[in-house]
Amino acid sequence: MIKETDLENIPDLLIKFNEPLSNYTYTKVGGPADILAFPATIEALTELSAKAKATDTPVTVLGNASNLIVRDGGIRGLVILLEKLDSVKVAGYTIEAQAGAKLKEVTQVAQANSLTGFEFACGIPGSIGGAVFMNAGAYGGEISQVLVSCKVMDAEGNVSVLSASEMQFGYRHSVIRDKNLIVLSAKFELQAGDPTQIQNEMDRLNFLRESKQPLEYPSCGSVFKRPVGHFAGQLIQEAKLQGQRIGGVEVSKKHAGFMVNVADGNATDYEKLIALVIEKVKENSGVTLEPEVRIIGEK
């Protein structure tokens, strides 16, 4: 296991020990990370990864911790949060954003530079790294439609660039998950647009999101993938599960596809409620819901 002395001389690196991950997740649940690291440069991340490999320390990389549930026992070993790797650069019709850059901020950069095609992501509460990892999408758009390449690091510390076709994108899926890669940055190809029209479209999508989603409570976003031929929220509603509560977590009364932390809930509450919803929807409709949210850590 990596020691504090192994990390002291790495520049541009903030380290916290036994840090509750509930301080960083959108659900406000999650036990402690043994070691929580915030690299501010790619060089710091590379050196940190090398130290972890040399000491056989397990590594978990998180983006913005939005579509994620960390279990109450926390995560052993080293947890890396990429939020400080957040630079965004524009060159012509191309935007290159580091993994920790927030989607919302990247869409604002696109609008300011009269670039269209990224509006769909304006309300997704995640980072570029997490969005690429799961091919995030909303309102008919998804990352795979605009990504042209992705710079990644593997478990050995090797850095490479994957083309869009090499990403093997699917619905809420990419090769990043399959091969346990770390997203360093991504390039997006957009088109010239009118900044006023782009802003109007972003305002429209944000209004839809705010009117339909329970943004007033902590949540992990959309809990389930969309089943073929159905909408998860509608199936949950038809099973009369809106308002169903376990501990401090309930199926949102505003949007059945969300589970919200209304009263100091924990990850166990989330997992039990997810299991209950899957069971009841299956009984009611015959459809088996599949979680979209990523669940990690120890119980």
From Swiss-Prot:
CC cofactor: FAD
Enzyme Commission number: 1.3.1.98
UniProt-recorded name of the protein: UDP-N-acetylenolpyruvoylglucosamine reductase
Active site annotation, chain numbering: 172, 222, 292
PROSITE patterns: FAD_PCMH
One GO term of the biological process aspect: regulation of cell shape
GO cellular component, one term: cytosol
Pfam families listed in its UniProt record: FAD_binding_4, MurB_C
Organism annotation: Lactococcus lactis subsp. cremoris (strain MG1363)
Chief location category: cytoplasm
Catalytic activity: UDP-N-acetyl-alpha-D-muramate + NADP(+) = UDP-N-acetyl-3-O-(1-carboxyvinyl)-alpha-D-glucosamine + NADPH + H(+)
GO terms assigned for molecular function: FAD binding; UDP-N-acetylmuramate dehydrogenase activity
Recorded superkingdom: Bacteria
NCBIfam families associated with the record: murB, PRK13905.1
Gene: murB
Membrane-spanning segments: none
Pathway noted in the entry: Cell wall biogenesis; peptidoglycan biosynthesis
Record's keyword terms, sorted: Cell cycle, Cell division, Cell shape, Cell wall biogenesis/degradation, Cytoplasm, FAD, Flavoprotein, NADP, Oxidoreductase, Peptidoglycan synthesis
Gene3D superfamilies per the UniProt record, alphabetical: 3.30.465.10, UDP-N-acetylenolpyruvoylglucosamine reductase, C-terminal domain, Uridine Diphospho-n-acetylenolpyruvylglucosamine Reductase, domain 2
UniProt subcellular location: Cytoplasm
Primary role: Cell wall formation.
Residue intervals of the FAD-binding PCMH-type domain: 28-193
Cytoplasm as UniProt keyword: yes
